Structure formats: C-alpha cells, structure tokens
Curated annotation (Swiss-Prot):
Keywords: Cytoplasm, Gluconeogenesis, Glycolysis, Isomerase
Protein name, as recorded: Glucose-6-phosphate isomerase
Keyword set includes Isomerase: yes
Gene3D superfamilies: 1.10.1390.10, Glucose-6-phosphate isomerase like protein, domain 1
An annotated GO BP: gluconeogenesis
Record flagged with keyword Lipid metabolism: no
Phylogenetic placement of the source organism: Bacteria, Pseudomonadati, Pseudomonadota, Gammaproteobacteria, Vibrionales
Entry function: Catalyzes the reversible isomerization of glucose-6-phosphate to fructose-6-phosphate.
Domain of life: Bacteria
C-alpha cells in the first residue's frame, strides 16, 4: 500500500526550500557560459529514437541531487514496485493500477487477487486481432453484403481522447478505413459525423465499461436510431455495432452480439485505457501489427521506468523538474508544444491524463493538502502556437515551463517545410532561454541605420528577459513504437508526481458531483414550469432556458 508521507515534512523538501532562495536568481545564460558540458550533463537518450534535453531548465546538479532525495524520501521506488506488482494502490476504489499489464510484452505474470491477468489480456488481444483482420480485409460484411468503410468510435473521456489522439498521430499508417470519433452529448457532434456516412457500410464501436455512461449511451442510441431508419430490422444491429464493455446484459439488450463485445477490467483506468480493448479503434485505424508496435514502445518505457536508477530515469527526471517549478517557483501551468501536426491532440490527451489524475486537494491520509498539486496542462502544435500565445510565454508575467516535442524526420517532406518547422523548434527554446538584452536591441537598431535617440522609447518593448525554462524532446520520427514510448513517458511522469505529492492519482471523484446534479436537473427540463428549487442563479438560468427554447 502506498505510504502516507507528506512531502513538505521531509528533509529533502526543507533542503529544496532553502536551495530555492539561492537558485531563484539563476540565469540560464550564466549556467551555459560557465559549463561547456551542460548539454551533455543535462540530457539523456532513450534507445535510438528519443532525446530528452533538459539543460535549458533553472537547475544545477545540486538542484537535481536534492530533487532525487525528495523522490527517495517519499519512497518512490517502493511505489513503482507496488504499481507494477498489482497492489491495489487506487485505495479509494480498491483497485490495482495495471495499464502496464496491457502492454506487458514480456508476458511475465502479473497477479491481481491471486490470479495472473496476462492470459486474459492476451485473449482479448487475440480477439481484437481477429476482429481487426475481418474488418480491414473486407471479410466482415454489413447487412446488405457490403464491406465496412467507416468506423465510428462512440465514447467519452478516456474512451475517446486516447484512441483519437493515437489515430490522428499515426495517420501515415492508416488502413483503408475512415475513422470517426463521437464524444460530446451535444447532438451536433453525432449529427455532423453521421451526415455523410452510409448506414450500410458503417460500423459503430460503443466504448463504455458499464454501458451506462450518459453521454456515450445517448450517442449510442442516436446512432442505432440513425442506422435502423435505413436498415429497418433490429437484427441487423449485430453486423454494425460492437461493444467495448463488461456489461454483458446491457450489451445484449442493445442488440450487439456478445461475441463482438471486448472486455477490459477494473484495474484499467479510463484515461490509461487505450492499450486495452478501448484501443480497438486504433487497431482498425492503423492495423493490428502497428497497434502491437505501440504496445511495444510503451512497454519499453515502462521497463525503463521500473528498472532505471532514478538519476537516469526519464519519467522521474521530467516529474521532478515539474515539481521544482510547481512547488518552489510557483508556476501554475505547463505547456506541451508538439512541432508535428499529427500530434495535434497530444496536449489535450495529457491535459486529461494529468489534470484528472493529479488535480487533487486531499492527501492519502484523507487530509487537505497545504501545498500545490497538479498543474494546469495546455498546449497546441507549433508553429500555430507561436502566432497565438507564445507572446505571453516570452514576455508575460507568468512562468510557464514548456515541453517542446519534434521529429527529425517528417512523414511529409514537402520542399523545405520541415527544415522551416525545425528551425522554429530550435529557435523558440533558444529565445526563451537566452532572450535579447537592451544592448542587443540597440545594436540591431543602429545596424539598421537608426540612432539611439530615435528608438529609445521603443527599445524596452523589444527586450526579452529570457530565463524561461523548457524541455526539448527530439524524436527520430512519429512511429507507433516511438509514440508508445512517448505516451508512457508522460503517464509515468504523472504517476511519479502523484506519489511525491502524496495523493491518489487514479480516482476522479471530482467529476461526480456535476453528474449527480445534472441527473437531478434533467427531469426539471421536461416541462415549461418555472423552477425555484435551486439557488437564484441556477433557477434564473433554467427558467431563461425554458423561455427561450419555446
């Protein structure tokens, strides 16, 4: 069981607090000027495909030593071992946390409640493989005998964001199938998705563990209604719907053949589920062999995380640097900035992964925390972000540590597009780190033929303070295997931070209250009667809605 250790009570935390008093004045320009080996000392590779450069951070070797001590004193190593061994570290739900078992390519036993789960994991993978082959090869026919051309994944949260992110990231590996993802209960989402589809050639994947998720089942019933408006026979549903669920009764009642139900288990958290049956849409999108490559990459990073010394452990290094900014520098957010258009949903995926996992205010002892936990995660692809929010990162008043991610090899090497993209990738971290001094700005004006008197009022606006921290993650190319490793890198970073912050990262009770209130309000919207049972604001909003919808 995870220990209940308040990190602020450790000697390492006290040492870091004292160290920050000296380190807050660190200048990246000085750190690089004083150490020609800084890049070599503060960078690491993973295999031959991933390079992590963390040299442009406001850290010294002393900083890292104290951060590693914090990891030791909060018993991170023991926590890692407990997670991988199947201990029920999700205490509030009495569950193990074993998304690592889903991609356990070594096939070594993983025991939960006395049972090795790997035979079940492998059985579902084999079932996914066979199903994928039938659909992709065209052997599976719809009710009119035509091949499936379009697949619609109906889910929300972890049943949508992960598969959608991966399917978009790996479009270069696309099968002949067209993938669509519906998540929002707003009817516009499914209506627009179905507008151009043919019921005779469309397959729906209904992704809901319980088969009761409000948004997913609302969309599922609308999808079935749309299908039956053409098919006219409930029996045809079985050829056009599959379920990613564990609720056999509800799946069968819906009309889905339970042979086409793909199970997963309570030790698979939603936001960590894309390597489970929830990844069936990924299999159909990129082919089963490429899905296995994704699992391989994730497994290799899992093994690295479980076995590497803390000082060489990439997820741990990223996590500790994040804690340095979050808890000592007072940074409130982190930006994830992929310089690859295929990764356009990567930041959104880990926005969910991080904020739902570590957005907690109660520690493992049930007490309110008196320190900062999870940061706000956000980001967009480069170079779009440069023309949107980089102004604030460069010259704003907030400290925003950034992760820059880019591939050396593009899947679309059109003329000089990729060199221009990469030039921006390299330039941004250099600009953020070193900025531009008043003297440099003045020299540029003089070189352009201006006098200092002419530009003296403009100069302050063109100065860049620099000293803005970044990590650079350079990958060889966005492949299934590399994406799997990158995904696991961030997952295990999140886990590491949760351990150190003494919180439970694998529940999400914060989403429940809104659901409960929505279920109470829904019946109140069925008539035109005025509502008075809530606070004045909610009453006023509901009553205005009722008036306007007439």
């Amino acid at each position: 069981m995870l220990k209940n250790i308040n990190p602020t009570h450790t000697q390492a935390w006290k040492d870091l607090t004292a160290h920050y008093e000296d380190a807050q004045d660190l200048q990246l320009s000085d750190l690089f000027a004083n150490d020609s080996e800084r890049f070599n000392k503060f960078s690491a590779t993973f295999g031959s495909d991933i390079l992590l450069d963390y040299s442009k951070n406001l850290i010294t070797e002393e900083t890292l030593t104290k951060l590693f001590a914090l990891a030791e004193q909060t018993e991170l190593k023991a926590a890692i071992a407990e997670m991988f061994s199947g201990e029920k570290i999700n205490k509030t739900e009495d569950r193990a946390v074993l998304h690592s078992a889903l991609r356990n390519r070594s096939n070594t036993p993983v025991v939960v409640d006395g049972e090795d789960v790997m035979p079940k994991v492998n059985a579902v993978l084999e079932k996914m493989k066979a199903f994928t082959a039938r659909i992709v090869d065209g052997d599976w026919k719809g009710y009119t005998g035509q091949e499936i051309t379009d697949v619609v994944n109906v889910g929300i949260g972890g049943s949508d964001l992960g598969p959608y992110m991966v399917s978009e990231a790996l479009v270069p590996y696309k099968t002949r199938l067209n993938m669509h993802f519906v998540s929002n209960v707003d009817g516009t989402h499914i209506a627009e998705t179905l507008k151009d589809l043919n019921p005779e050639t469309t397959l729906f994947l209904i992704a809901s563990k319980t088969f009761t998720t409000q948004e997913t089942m609302t969309n599922a019933h609308s999808a079935r209604d749309w299908f039956l408006a053409t098919a006219q026979d409930q029996a045809h549903v079985a050829k056009h719907f599959a379920a990613l669920s564990t609720n056999v009764g509800s799946v069968s009642e819906f009309g889905i053949d339970t042979d086409n139900m793909f199970e997963f288990w309570d030790w698979v958290g939603g936001r960590y589920s894309l390597c489970s049956a929830i990844g069936l849409s990924i299999c159909l999108s990129i082919g089963f062999d490429n899905f296995v490559e994704l699992l391989d990459g994730a497994h290799e990073m899992d093994q690295h995380f479980a076995q590497a010394p803390l000082e060489e452990n990439l997820p741990v290094i990223l996590a500790l640097i994040g804690i340095w900014y979050n808890n000592f520098h007072g940074a409130e957010s982190e930006a994830i900035l992929p310089y690859d258009q295929y990764l356009h949903r990567f930041a959104a995926y880990f926005q969910q992964g991080n904020m739902e996992s570590n957005g907690k205010c109660v520690d493992r002892g049930g007490n309110p925390v008196d320190y900062q936990t999870g940061p706000i995660i956000w980001g967009e692809p480069g170079t779009n972000g440069q023309h949107a929010f980089y102004q604030l990162i460069h010259q704003g008043t907030k400290l925003i540590p950034c992760d820059f991610i880019a591939p050396s090899i593009s899947h679309n090497p059109l003329t000089d597009h990729h060199p221009k993209l990469m030039a921006n990738f390299f330039a941004q971290t250099e600009a953020l780190a070193f900025g531009k001094t008043k003297e440099q700005v003045e020299a540029e004006f003089v070189a352009a033929g201006k006098t200092l008197d002419e530009v003296k009022d403009l100069v302050p606006f063109k100065v860049f303070d620099g000293n803005r921290p970044t990590n650079s993650i350079l990958i060889k190319q966005v492949t299934p295997k590399v994406l799997g490793s990158l995904m696991a890198l961030y997952e295990q970073k999140i886990f590491t931070q949760g351990v150190i912050w003494n919180i439970f990262s694998f529940d999400q009770w914060g989403v429940e209250l809104g659901k409960q209130l929505a279920n109470q309000i829904l019946p109140e919207l069925n008539d035109a009667d005025s509502i008075a049972g809530h606070d004045s604001s909610t009453n006023g909003l509901i009553n205005a809605y009722k008036q306007w919808r007439k």
